Amino acid sequence: MIEVSGVSVRLSGKTIISDVAFTAKAGELTAIAGPNGSGKTTTMKAISGELAYGGSVRIGGDEVKGLKPWQLAAIRGVLPQASTISFPFTVREIVRMGLTSGLNLHPDKAEQTAAAALASVDLTGFEGRFYQELSGGEQQRVQLARVLCQIAEPVVDGKPCWLLLDEPVSSLDISHQLTIMTLARNFCERGGGVIAVMHDLNLTALFADRIVLMKSGRLAAPAASFEVLTDETMLSVFGLRVRINQVPADGTPFVLAHSAVSRP
């Protein structure tokens, strides 16, 4: 379980997020959604230990601030937002960077782990290609394969591991969006946990168990089932007039936007 309690982050004297609190459970995919600039990425960086924070973040009962980098690397893998940074390395070299927390792996085992991670994101055969030659979507999948090298199993020594994914499908075509979200779903079903920043609410409703809505650096709604997606909430958080239907087969909510409205 990841417990976020009263978390605040200040950068350059400015409060970016304030009093964020929710719980994410192993075996579930928890989504964080909200408008641009609402504090989603900052929240993820606090949870992962990348940013100093006030309040408390506990993974499996351990305070993140008290864990050493190698301890964090053993229990959580982080996929940052897609970036335009160019790495002068091959795909194989980047993916195997995820193995730095397991340097004692036999070379054959390391190669097998990297190959399995690449296969899971549909990049078999890309091992020798240079990162900067790839499309944005391919680069995003390479970075996810690196994370899957680091966290190859959802449960280690009886304790769940976590994938912290910041917009994992933002650059992907629909086919690979479904591939990656299915992979995340399977990770949860095997005992691990996933927290993912998402923008597509319909894709989120299809794969996530719970959703946390943020606005202006604060929670707009607690981690809850998708009953929180009401017309009123969507208008308040996103400034959109919507109609929320349900998929007849299973009742999954489906958001249809009417029009944008002026924000206060």
UniProtKB/Swiss-Prot annotation:
The complex is composed of two ATP-binding proteins (HmuV), two transmembrane proteins (HmuU) and a solute-binding protein (HmuT). Its main location: membrane. This is Hemin import ATP-binding protein HmuV. GO terms for molecular function: ATP binding; ATP hydrolysis activity. Its EC number is 7.6.2.-. Belongs to the ABC transporter superfamily. Heme (hemin) importer (TC 3.A.1.14.5) family. Keywords: ATP-binding, Cell inner membrane, Cell membrane, Membrane, Nucleotide-binding, Translocase, Transport. It is a peripheral membrane protein. Part of the ABC transporter complex HmuTUV involved in hemin import. Responsible for energy coupling to the transport system. It comes from the Bacteria. It is found in: Cell inner membrane. It comes from Rhizobium leguminosarum. The keyword Nucleotide-binding applies. Residues 2-241 form the ABC transporter domain. One of its GO terms (cellular component) is plasma membrane. The keyword Transport applies. ATP binds at G34, P35, N36, G37, S38, G39, K40, T41.
